């Protein structure tokens, strides 16, 4: 790994993390449901699907941009660990149905948004 790749990852990941921090801070928790985490994971999933859709349709995205946007920005924007902790917290608080809704919603929505981004990019 060279210095250019490291810089792209640091900058992309940092911008993604700042975006996640801002979005999560602006959005309130909706009736104990961690909506901010769902939104940042959804945005990252859609963007990553869109990037790969462009690649599969023959759009030329340089390896540097793929690293910056995909691994860096989308990696910094999304957060599996926060999703896991929030689900654990809901379970610990006895909110079994909210925990189940959090798991189901995050997984189904993010997979669908990868698919949607992929399809929209290929049009």
UniProtKB/Swiss-Prot annotation:
GO cellular component: plasma membrane
An individual GO BP term: cellular detoxification of fluoride
Gene Ontology molecular-function annotations: fluoride channel activity; metal ion binding
Activity regulation, short description: Na(+) is not transported, but it plays an essential structural role and its presence is essential for fluoride channel function.
Location of this chain's protein in the cell: Cell membrane
Membrane topology: Multi-pass membrane protein
Transmembrane regions: 5-25, 35-55, 67-87, 100-120
Alphabetical keyword list: Cell membrane, Ion channel, Ion transport, Membrane, Metal-binding, Sodium, Transmembrane, Transmembrane helix, Transport
Any coiled-coil regions, as ranges: none
Catalysed conversion reaction: fluoride(in) = fluoride(out)
Residues noted as binding Na(+) in the record, renumbered to the chain: 75, 78
Taxonomy, superkingdom: Archaea
HAMAP family in UniProt: FluC
Database matches in PANTHER family: FLUORIDE EXPORT PROTEIN 1-RELATED
Role, per record: Fluoride-specific ion channel. Important for reducing fluoride concentration in the cell, thus reducing its toxicity.
Similarity comment: Belongs to the fluoride channel Fluc/FEX (TC 1.A.43) family.
Protein name: Fluoride-specific ion channel FluC
Gene name per UniProt: fluC
